Amino acid sequence: MAISSKEQETKKVKISVDKNPVDTSFEKWAQPGHFSRTLAKGPKTTTWIWNLHADAHDFDSQTSSLEEVSRKIFSAHFGQLAVIFLWLSGMYFHGARFSNYVAWLSNPTGIKPSAQVVWPIVGQEILNGDVGGGFQGVQVTSGWFQLWRASGITTEFQLYCTAIGGLGMAALMLFAGWFHYHKAAPKLEWFQNVESMMNHHLAGLLGLGCLGWAGHQIHLSLPINKLLDSGVSPQEIPLPHEFLINRELMAQLYPSFSKGLVPFFTLNWAEYSDFLTFKGGLNPVTGGLWLSDTAHHHLALAVLFLAAGHMYRTNWGIGHSMKEILEAHKGPFTGNGHEGLYEILTTSWHAQLAINLAMMGSLSIIVAHHMYAMPPYPYIATDYPTQLSLFTHHMWIGGFCVVGAGAHASIFMVRDYNPAENYNNLLDRIIRHRDAIVSHLNWVCIFLGFHSFGLYIHNDTMRALGRSQDMFSDTAIQLQPIFAQWVQSIHTLAPGNTAPNALATASYAFGGEVVSVGNKVAMMPISLGTADFMVHHIHAFTIHVTVLILVKGFLFSRNSRLIPDKANLGFRFPCDGPGRGGTCQVSGWDHVFLGLFWMYNSLSVAIFHFSWKMQSDVWGSVSPSGNVSHITGGNFAQSAITINGWLRDFLWAQASQVIQSYGSALSAYGLIFLAAHFVWAFSLMFLFSGRGYWQELIESIVWAHNKIKVAPAIQPRALSITQGRAVGVAHYLLGGIGTTWAFFLARIISVG
């Protein structure tokens, strides 16, 4: 390895701040638009209020100082954390004040979770359904009850205490946000010291975070859950601190506790295998992962992250330098490789954010898929509404993050990219062969679209003609997903073979036996067939189109053959000015706008597939003799192979619960279903009409106001083209999300 040159020697880390850089002035903040000279003058037209909202958090437009932008972002993060703690506090408070948590804890299979009781004002107390145990309330599907049980919370008092703790943390975060902007604001070099930042986040946030959670799981969750699992009532379980200070109490449950730390220091770690296990599979009592497995997992992660937090070179001259690692990365086809990327990532927060959003979005989608295959908390697997809600939620979060990655990648290209500093490096070479990338991606989209859709069209046609023997199906022309089935089989065979210490498979989705809790299926092998093969290629198609739109937007955000000077027009512009027809929807912003619709397409197909597949092939009841009867009786394999099947046997058949919900505790979902359709339809008014139409209409209305001498002082203006599109896509997605939410929950709460 090359010795670092003098330029690359790591600067010593020191905490450097500016004292009292910005006054705390309520007078200034009280003036709307104080952050912009133009907006601070006040409104002349109605466009002002739109620009106020668009630019309030666009720190780039408020100052050209990277240090000042960094400080604003840093301070805003504390504000975000304050909101999160406030929200957490509210959740715990609802659990303490309005929920049936303790009743649920004593009978989790017979009582449904509820944390909201609707007050009777105009008859809406109809929403308080009977959730069992004599409690009337709204059934909740957030998974909080299961998480609280896994944490070892057994009383409302503990929930109250945590809620108060959350409020305290929120106040602390608000103070920190103010303090680090107005009193002691970090200098730019502090924000740019990536080695120190990586060390602290890896060791502190992830390492100590995992260690703390592992400690909590070992000392509190495990003993309390062991007692709950064996039927001890929550009221009889000792208080949490008893388990911390009374070693004899712990030793009764986990004998190795009587040996203390001797096995640890004598490296005889196997002694601790009574509470740090490697069982695999699910706890047959709760249908969740073994808590001793998850404690072991978090302890192992803590060790890894604490080690990783000592990996980067700061004040001691040992360890990695991020710049050196990046610049050493040179492949045979990548020219100067990663040269210049360090400078990009330390001076462009948009570039940094784009990568982080892509990673976090992908991670959220991975979480969605793990949470049903390996249900992490006790009794969550048999709470079907919660399982469906959490899958849908994490898919949506992931989708928005991934599109956000495309957005900020384009903003980086327009605002922060410097061609002179990126000659022949990886980014430059990607941009130079963008035509090949985009045209290949386009070909893939066309291929996937026509072939996957073509399979469905073929099946619909054959079924219409009564030629079922000529259809693609498990009973005619089979298209089995052989690679997926092979992956399932190697995971099923792993325990005792390639995973010699595991007692059971990582997930029963791969194979194995049916795990049932309270006569309901928690998890069982998911058989994959022709219907899955077909819909998976629809997933591939919609995801690739989303990627095509976002990647094209990013690669062509500075210039294109059509508009060579795009970078001068900015991130969002409606078209290339008068006299240039056919240049609409080419800005980076417009690609994000279009990408959002395809993201919605992708996720709708994915969550519909999940919802139907689980109801058809996994979720259901188990008879005393062990027979499983699924909610929709296994109709997925034969119905999901035609478009008509999706429309008739999924959308229409399963919408009956939401459509017929009036007069029942689920009637709110019927109203939401209706209202969200309305919001969605409202969006089309913005998406399908031009600005001129509205400007003409407004001028007539203003004329009428002038006629009767009630003309407004602020001149009304139609929305700009971009504003109209923004309002349109926002209502389109909101309407779509609301409709899907009501459709899913009314259905699954009724039948699940």
Swiss-Prot record:
Where on this chain does chlorophyll a bind? Answer: 685, 693
Keyword field contains Flavoprotein:
no
Quick one: a GO cellular component term? Answer: chloroplast thylakoid membrane
**SUPFAM superfamilies, A to Z:** Photosystem I subunits PsaA/PsaB
UniProt remark on cofactor binding: P700 is a chlorophyll a/chlorophyll a' dimer, A0 is one or more chlorophyll a, A1 is one or both phylloquinones and FX is a shared 4Fe-4S iron-sulfur center.
Picking any one GO molecular function of the record gives:
4 iron, 4 sulfur cluster binding
What membrane topology is given? Multi-pass membrane protein
Record keywords: 4Fe-4S, Chlorophyll, Chloroplast, Chromophore, Electron transport, Iron, Iron-sulfur, Magnesium, Membrane, Metal-binding, Oxidoreductase, Photosynthesis, Photosystem I, Plastid, Thylakoid, Transmembrane, Transmembrane helix, Transport
Q: Where does phylloquinone bind?
A: 694
Q: What is its EC number?
A: 1.97.1.12
Answer yes or no on keyword Methyltransferase. Answer: no
Binding of [4Fe-4S] cluster: at which residues? 575, 584
Q: How does it assemble?
A: The PsaA/B heterodimer binds the P700 chlorophyll special pair and subsequent electron acceptors. PSI consists of a core antenna complex that captures photons, and an electron transfer chain that converts photonic excitation into a charge separation. The eukaryotic PSI reaction center is composed of at least 11 subunits.
- Sum up the protein's function in the record's words: PsaA and PsaB bind P700, the primary electron donor of photosystem I (PSI), as well as the electron acceptors A0, A1 and FX. PSI is a plastocyanin/cytochrome c6-ferredoxin oxidoreductase, converting photonic excitation into a charge separation, which transfers an electron from the donor P700 chlorophyll pair to the spectroscopically characterized acceptors A0, A1, FX, FA and FB in turn. Oxidized P700 is reduced on the lumenal side of the thylakoid membrane by plastocyanin or cytochrome c6.
Q: Which family does it belong to?
A: Belongs to the PsaA/PsaB family.
Q: Tell me the protein's name.
A: Photosystem I P700 chlorophyll a apoprotein A1
Q: Which organism is it from?
A: Porphyra purpurea (Red seaweed)
